Amino acid sequence: VTLKNVRSLTVQGMKFPGAPYSLKMACGENPKGYCGSLNQLPSTRMVNMAGYRAAWIEATEYKRGWDNYVAAASAGEDIDPPGRDLRLETLVGVLEGDIRIHNHCYMVDEMAQMIDMSKEFGYEIAAFHHAVEGYKAAPMLAEANICAVMWADWWGFKQEAFDMVRENLALVDYMQACAVIHSDDPIHVQRLNQEVAKAMSAGNRMGLEISPGRAIRWATLNAAKSLGLDDQIGSLAPGKNADIVLWSQHPLSVYSLAQQVWIDGHLRFDRGDASVQPTSDFNLGIITPG
């Protein structure tokens, strides 16, 4: 679910109106390592791929059954509907293009395998997350119109994360693929502007001549593209949502602070106004002694 960072008592109130849903898939050490530790499948990379293919085959048959039912019912036949399966309904949503795949993948060979599988079953991959070998996969990512969502300089914490370079994000961008900055670290994710600056600097040191205006797209327009929302957010243009951050200095400076945040044209944060700053809806009934 894609959320907007707005005040609400419920997740439903934060949902981005009309945004497509997303589904995470994973390949590599995480599924095989976790499931293997429980003596469950998939415990190898091969079984992981086999399990995915089996699931897509099952979803394809499930979709065919419902398509046949709808066609028969529309023709006036008195026919009972197939049984519902919420797991397969989710996969059918992917096959019909309503749910976007975000694929956890590190290595180029597994990205290639996932692309092959998407072609076999006729769905699209929105993005590969982590993609520490994105610089190797960049041409195939550009051809398939798949974003790579990457760290600036985080690697080496497990075997499949070893073969990264600091120029990873810059090289993916240089090859005209969709490069996106990210982090699942609780500190780095608060300073993605600085992560962009690090990745841009690495690219410039090798002579790629990346401008700040291009680099900032890694956190804005390209990120919106990975969510299927680049027609509404990610850049300042007529007809798009008025989502704007005003910085105290250059956005990529380590000294820069977000001064104001506007979402949908409304001021949602103002560093100089305590009444327009984040508050929690937890413990509202508890009186704190003055």
For each predicted feature, which ranges?
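Short hydrophobic/aromatic-enriched beta-strand-loop microsegments
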Residues: 123-130, 147-152
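A mature extracytoplasmic/lumenal domain signature
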Residues: 5-7, 107, 132, 152, ...
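Active-site environment of divalent metal-dependent phosphoester hydrolases
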Residues: 108-112, 131-138, 188-190
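C-terminal cap of metal-dependent C-N hydrolases
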Residues: 225, 237-282
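Amphipathic coiled-coil/heptad-repeat helices and related helical stalk/stem segments
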Residues: 87, 110, 134, 164-165, ...
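His/Asp/Glu-enriched, well-ordered alpha-helical/loop segment
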Residues: 100, 139-247, 267
